[in-house]
């Protein structure tokens, strides 16, 4: 017990109950070092027997590591927000998630936020008021006509960068933060995607170089809205070391291939969606199943019920722009009906 108290001065306590393993998305309350010192000092020695084991590690839990390193910037990115359930869940939880996860900068993909197709100015404003610094999109960006005029005057509402020159709106933005400049690029893939756009590989590389050279942005985040895993992985490999993160969207299914490439670029094929869980990609599953069984066109309403919030947390060294950590984010909740 004395050894535990001694080592605790240079680390934190990790409590491991061998009787059960917490699920990956379970919230873990992190206690600061001083609080743990007090806890252990008054903890009976006999309580350290049996299935209850104590391990000592240097530093805080991963979720709090960034607090002790002033050069680290933590980005939270949330995948495609689907319909009213998805946006209500995100708006209701975003500020709390920011605090719980020690987030510095928030990006959300809002491309399905309006009844599952596109986004409206009101929804975009609501998401920004909730804490989103930038909203990205994809192939459904034009589904709500009123968003066109809004994009002309709101550079934080992005459409894919690789639309032809002269297209209304912005495909990228650089924002100043308390930890330096952060660049965000939104691009759309070409494989199995409509409409066919300009080459995203060339467009993203050119824009990332411009951001670094002309605007001094070291931290650059790319939302690559694409269908195939091969195109997404190729994009990440193509610009490894040039940007801080390449995170895929569009498929609505969170993948488990998070990694940091050799050049320092964090990567995940798809962040997943923020939308109804009892569904097919956020839509009521029965009409989708019937469409597959009969080939008869049907409407696919946004589903209801439990909602999942899916995304990713990326830690970046603000001085070098290199990613130092990446972790999937996953949270389920019940929405109260009005």
Residue ranges and their predicted role:
Residues 13-16, 52-61:
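Hydrophobic alpha-helical signal peptides and transmembrane signal-/tail-anchor segments
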Residues 37-41, 45-49, 63-66:
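Cationic, amphipathic, low-complexity segments that mediate targeting or membrane/lipid association
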Residues 1-8:
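N-terminal helix-forming leader/targeting segments
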Residues 17-24, 63:
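Residue-level detector of structural "landmarks"
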Residues 4, 26-39:
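Short alpha-helix boundary/capping segments
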Residues 6, 45, 54-58:
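N-terminal start and proteolytic maturation junction detector
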Residues 69-338:
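Acidic, metal/ion-coordinating pockets
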